[in-house]
Amino acid sequence: MSARVERLAWRDIHLDPIDLPTAKLQLTLGLGSGLSRRPGDAPGRVYAVTDRGPNLFISQAIDDYGLTHLETLRGIRDAKIMPLPEIGPEIVELQVEGSSVSFVRRIPLHATSGARLHGAAPDGDDMEPLFDLSGQPLQPDPMGADTEAIAVMPDGSFFLAEEYGPSLLRADANGAVVGRWVVPGAERVMQQAGMEVRGVLPELAGQRRMNRGLEALCASPDGCWLYLGLQSGPSGADPGTTPIWKLDTASGELAGQWAYPFDAPASFLRDAARRKVGPGDPKVCEFAWAGEDRLVVLERIAHTTKLYLTDLSRLPEKRLLMSSDDHTDIGPDMEGMTILSPTEILLVSDNDFGVGRAETEFWRVSLDEPLLG
């Protein structure tokens, strides 16, 4: 199967800049963590999701923005500064028409009380240390979420995968989070008024590596089944595979599980040309439904993105649809993906809210034969 690619026009949505000692932190809405389409919607209507919000490495905050009072944090492993944790995760409705993508509306995620979800982490001993601009630790809060994938359901509601818990959020069409699925034993930590918290996720999901939680998600068109996967294999497990689970959307009951095999790290050519890559580097970032137990899988490191058509019953076989090593105009950090038509796939990059001045990229991948049916 051969592929043609086209970058679609898009103008990032600018947020208010933050004045810092030596430079302004310019921010844009980072809506590229996940994409989804609802069967029956108008052609080109898609839904995107942001993650937890902008964050800075400690060295970046000190060296690039003059936040020298953070010097005492420099030696804390994996520490991050979150300048605006209150931005929080949200859904963004978009329209693809011709060769452009346009903004329709933002749907903030919130509790049934109206309180916004935000970017701080829930309680747990396996969370990265997070600090505000003053250098104070962000307090754990069950209202925190780091959403990384989205599946829109036939009734207009949403499932969202987030990697802090990890957990699955169930939100209504207006963004009110009415339920949260977690691994057994995590119910107390995630409990919130007005939100049903159920310990139904596979226990293995709770063994995720830091920042490598639930990253890929899609639903069957009838809304009966969810497919979800960890970005990388669980901590201590074989780094050459990562689990894929199939869940009943009504009960959360496990209906299937598979081990998805990663390509050899050296085969991600654009990444291997920049640095030494190893077994823990490849990751799965998105699923798109292509038939019963058939998925398009977005597999990448950073600069090389590969799309595979995968019949789960025939793993480890997988069929390459496109590699960005053959289309070097495609930028890094492709995270979101959905199927626009039987022969068209839409990709979007995560621009990290414009930190580092990255732009969001939308790409249409056109195939010479249909994926569906």
Q: What is each of the regions a protein language model found here?
A:
Residues 1-373:
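Sequence/structural signature of beta-propeller domains
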